[in-house]
């Protein structure tokens, strides 16, 4: 990879969560405009990896770089200003705010400089509240509704939309398909492909194997804090033993669907 094409570099990262040694020497790169998926059973370190990048659970040692700048010691707020956005597990929208208020939050001060910088580069790829509502028409019908009045699928749309209006270079997505109907899962997959086509990179943590393999350019499987497989979706599909051992037989069967 050309260095200029690599947005995120994770080098020999070791992260502890309370007293647990969770990430045990993880190495990862996310190129610009690519989707990199992290798969693995529960408790293997997927969410901790996302938290380590976003400054929520800083690594004990190792390097996390974004666009050539170290993220060590930076707050999540500062990291967001640099062009990262997080769609957290469980959605975490502001349920006491309306849909419109949720969408306006990222541009109300969080990353105005970031938004303006990207606008100058390419105004056509700029995500606005209007463009997000075009992408998620269900939200347009619920603009004045509180976040607590939305279905799970609508809350996930809002969480993704809220990330997009900050116009990030890289979006960290933690289990975006969790609790969604199959129809919404397909929609989330289409949205991720569209984000990639507009130049966004995505680091995706996902339990839904079929979704991850349908969108990812590169896949890593994590087990006990280390990557036990790294390759393309096609390479993973041709390794049923890896699928069985690290993701379970049902996951391998799901690929036949």
Give the location of each predicted region.
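The feature captures the beta-strand-to-loop junction immediately N-terminal to the Walker
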Residues: 39-41
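Helix-to-loop junction immediately C-terminal to a conserved catalytic motif
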Residues: 54
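Catalytic Walker B motif of ABC-type/P-loop ATPase nucleotide-binding domains
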Residues: 171-175
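ABC-type ATPase nucleotide-binding domains, specifically the catalytic core motifs of the NBD
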Residues: 18, 36, 74, 99-127, ...
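Conserved ABC transporter NBD signature motif
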Residues: 62-71, 82, 124-129, 134
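Conserved ABC ATPase signature
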Residues: 146-150, 154
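ABC ATPase C-loop
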Residues: 163-164
């Amino acid at each position: 990879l050309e260095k200029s094409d690599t947005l995120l570099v994770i080098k020999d990262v070791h992260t502890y969560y309370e007293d647990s040694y969770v990430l045990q020497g993880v190495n990862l790169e996310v190129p610009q405009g690519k989707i990199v998926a992290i798969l693995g059973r529960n408790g293997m370190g997927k969410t901790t990896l996302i938290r380590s990048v976003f400054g929520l659970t800083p690594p004990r040692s190792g390097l996390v770089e974004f666009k050539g700048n170290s993220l060590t010691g930076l707050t999540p707020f500062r990291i967001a200003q640099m062009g990262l956005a997080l769609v957290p597990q469980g959605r975490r929208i502001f349920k006491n705010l309306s849909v419109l208020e949720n969408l306006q939050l990222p541009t109300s001060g969080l990353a105005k400089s970031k938004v303006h910088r990207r606008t100058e580069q390419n105004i056509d790829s700029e995500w606005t509240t209007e463009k997000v509502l075009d992408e998620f028409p269900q939200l347009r019908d619920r603009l004045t509704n509180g976040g607590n009045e939305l279905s799970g699928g609508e809350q996930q749309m809002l969480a993704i939309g809220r990330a997009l209006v900050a116009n990030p270079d890289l979006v960290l997505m933690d289990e975006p398909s969790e609790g969604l109907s199959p129809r919404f899962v397909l929609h989330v997959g289409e949205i991720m492909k569209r984000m990639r086509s507009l130049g966004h990179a995505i680091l995706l943590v996902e339990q839904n194997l079929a979704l991850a393999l349908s969108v990812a350019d590169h896949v890593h499987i994590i087990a006990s804090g280390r990557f036990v497989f790294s390759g393309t979706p096609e390479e993973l599909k041709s390794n049923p033993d890896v699928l069985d051992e690290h993701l379970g037989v049902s996951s391998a069967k799901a690929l036949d669907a």
